[in-house]
């Protein structure tokens, strides 16, 4: 089985994720929970060659396969156990700036989206 090398951009995304994970104060952090941000780059195409669903830009995708959380909460004087299961989702952060390179704002935006309930 052949091994494939990660692109330089993916290595940079991995480094940015480590940097983010060390300073993130969010309640939940996809980096701290062991999820991976995958780099993508969709260059500008010639006008006549653009497929209908094509979106130019660069960014990261984070795949969330399954999550389950339980919390003990107190509501109106009652102790309750709250559970939440999520079967999976996909976070996609796409930037259209003129410098198609990994940048920390992509990772921070992915973490913000990960924290939306």
From Swiss-Prot:
Keywords: Early protein
Superkingdom of origin organism: Viruses
Name assigned to this protein: Early E3 13.3 kDa protein
